[in-house]
Amino acid sequence: MAAARKAAGAPAPAAPSQDARPQVRPKAEGWTQAVDAEGRPKLQFAQSKRVKQPPQHLADMTLDERIAKAKEMGIPGFRAKQLSVHYFQHYTADPAEMTDLPAAEREKLVEEFLPPLLTEVRRLKTDDGATIKFLWRLFDGALVESVLMRYKNRITLCISSQCGCGMNCPFCATGQNGLTRNMSTAEIVDQIVQANRVIAAGELDAPNAQEIAEEADHSGLGEEADFAEGEGTPSSYSPSGPQRVGNIVFMGMGEPLANYKRVMNAVRRMVDPAPEGLGMSARGITISTVGLVPAIRKLADENLPITFALSLHAPDDELRDELIPVNDRWKADEAIDAAYYYYKTTGRRVSIEYALIKDMNDHPWRADLLAEKLNARGRGWVHVNPIPLNPTPNSVWTSSEPQVMREFLRRLNGAGVPTTLRDTRGKEIDGACGQLAAAED
């Protein structure tokens, strides 16, 4: 830990004295932390080896691999490129729509390259149809969710990377369900293709005037605008605006960095130029983590200009041990050091996510401590995004009071740490941050 702090270039400041700290809530209130045989918080970093894998899909392969497979099938390699155009640019897997392919080859190509991955079970709309939560059934019956949001000048998709989550965070509905399995590269990518298909069909409505005004009030630094630099300038909504997903946030179900290889392959498929991939901007992609420190440093070294978000939720280990069980493995300062390493390596500003929980982590001294720790490592490298805690089933915890949230933000901004309260799109349909649980009822 000390070595990591030295590498980051600054020591962590001392915490306030114990006398200056109000007691946190009793550890047993609301939940009991599951522990392993050694008494450590029970975490799932990997899926069972007995889990059946999804069928291989075009999106699992590079263009060269698709061409090679087509040739193995006795089909000219350029047909794989044509098929890629249909999937990544026309968002279709229907052979009837692929009229540029010989009729004798269409069914065979679709069967081999485009097996069905996500079957829509249900969609729920809110925000006058500008937000849609999808429930998908995967090939093995596992359920995942994604949330599509149209803002006035961008379209954002919150995607899942795992079926469930093994991080066991008590205030997150996904974390309380445990980990079923990792999603494949193609299952991750197919969420975007399916969303683009919905947009192309005109099934995602425009935001209403109030939402446009509220986003303008945030100066482009609300829910996801801050994550895609250069794409968050407020303007009036135009029907001629974006007609496909431009922003991706890995903030759905799962811990993305616990499924590192498949998530990174999915990111590459997103940014690969069409028809090899979706041709998206890497700057519009955000990966969030609860703090898997070695993976954060590995991500920094990937040389991809994506945005990184650290779900911190408490600046002190006393509380973070309770809220974020992985803090037992890597402490708060180690996670912040890794986030700072990401900034120094990539030049990309880091986001700190912080769910404000009433009487738990919203104390003024915690805002001050957070500011001290961030400023000790430098200025201009980080933006804090507090968000009111979203309700989850059976939780006794609630969101902070508005005046408490305002004071928390005031202290951070006053200390020179750029801070903006995040939007809570999708809360009414359990589609907001921490609410995704993939339940059919």
Regions of interest found by a model, annotated:
Residues 430:
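Phosphate/nucleotide-binding beta-alpha loop and adjacent structural elements of enzyme active sites
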Residues 422-427:
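Acidic carboxylate-rich catalytic motifs and surrounding loops in phosphoryl-/glycosyl-chemistry enzymes
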